[in-house]
Amino acid sequence: GSEMCIRDSMRNIDTAMKKAYPKGFQKENIIYTELSNDKVMLFNYTSGTTGFSKGVMLTGNNLAGNVTFGIRTGLLKKGEKVLSFLPLAHAYGCAFDFLTATAVGTHVTLLGKTPSPKILMKAFEEVKPNLIITVPLVIEKIYKNVIQPLINKRSMKWALNIPLLDNQIYAQIRKKLIDALGGRFKEVIIGGAAMNPEVTDFFYKIKFPFT
């Protein structure tokens, strides 16, 4: 059946590749179909916040504009690492976690699992990404699970009301959060929706590197 054909193909793929590319598969062997950039290249789906999810028709220019922006602003550089956990069916994750990263030669690790705080923390520790691109919901969950239990302790609330000591504590919390996200990122970019003002205010207070 079809499964047997797939298994046979996988077993023979090395032999077939050597036969087709005796000098090895090189960048010159990659040939893309030439299409005008005003053609629809992709259907990306909205989150459905204003009703049912909608398929948005994106042209080559739409995608190229995002990638060009990412390259010109130096979001990512060749050899850096990215942990991709946003849906690639949405424009945000697709444009920056995948297309821009691929264009500049960034190493992309696909999470492949539902991004619960526990799974994300483990992945951040392993990958240590240089840039984190996310949505408010993910960051708010991390705040709820990592930060809130700490700052809601009675002793911590008391200490945060003492001048000078509060800044030292905020610095420690900032380091704890940065370390929890891999410790190597230059910035966390949060977009796609409005973030909880409580989380935003706290991040500004501890001088967390986000935008």
PLM features: what roles do these ranges have?
Residues 29, 34, 162-200:
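Alpha-helix-centered segments that form part of catalytic cores
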Residues 1-6:
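Short, small-residue-biased leader/transition segments that mark boundaries at the very start
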Residues 41-67:
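Conserved AMP-binding A3 loop
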Residues 64-81, 88-174, 184, 205-209:
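Conserved AMP-binding/adenylation subdomain of ANL enzymes
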Residues 21-45, 52, 75-81:
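Conserved pre-ATP/AMP-binding loop-to-beta segment of ANL
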Residues 48-49, 105, 192:
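Conserved G/P- and acidic residue-centered "switch" motifs that form tight phosphate/ATP-binding loops
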Residues 34, 57, 133:
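Short aromatic/basic micro-patch
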Residues 40, 46-49, 82, 87, ...:
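Conserved S/T- and glycine-rich ATP-binding loop of Class I adenylate-forming
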